[in-house]
Amino acid sequence: ENTPLLRASRALSKAGAFVAGMESVEKFQEVNTVAVDANGLYPVGSVELHSIKSFAQSRIDEAILDAASLMVRVDGLLKDIFLEMIGGNTRILKQVDQVAYYDRAGLCAEIDGKTVLIGSRTLMEQFNISMPSKDYEKKFVRGDREILYLANSGEVTAMFVLSYRTSPDIERWLDVLARREISLVVQSTDPNITEARIAKDYGYPEE
């Protein structure tokens, strides 16, 4: 019986993983980088929507449906929040085409033949969209709260005020990776998930 391997397998099984054998151990013992999706760091229930502010005479239900359609299309962090807001009815989701991600800014897509953006103020400004003042933003951003904007056809339609919670289980595993000096590569379509946020939330080194 390979006792060390057995102990490792038992520990990993609690996280839904396993070691296939000593060959796998030898193959991965020199790993120095781990790639993970943002959903792995902020699992279901980690993101809280505090409020929605609508603009441009837009119907808030249409804004939510646009956001839900895009988040489901890209499996975004906010997917479950918006699905819950439409009662989990995926049949009413709109067709989403030509999705593009702008690094550290957000997403652009075609929905119902119109250009829809969801992301940061930076993304909106890249598309020359008129924005609420930063003083207006400050009324809603306090503590760890963040903002994402939704725009449709060149106009801001909604502002979402969000916060992100950490997971104790994820924190433990990231601590193991950090102590072993394993680099973390995070794939995210949410501009609020940055190196600085991960470092602040989980104590994982930025470099």
Where are these regions (language model features)?
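Helix-loop-beta junctions that constitute the ligand-sensing/allosteric loops
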Residues: 142-149, 182-183
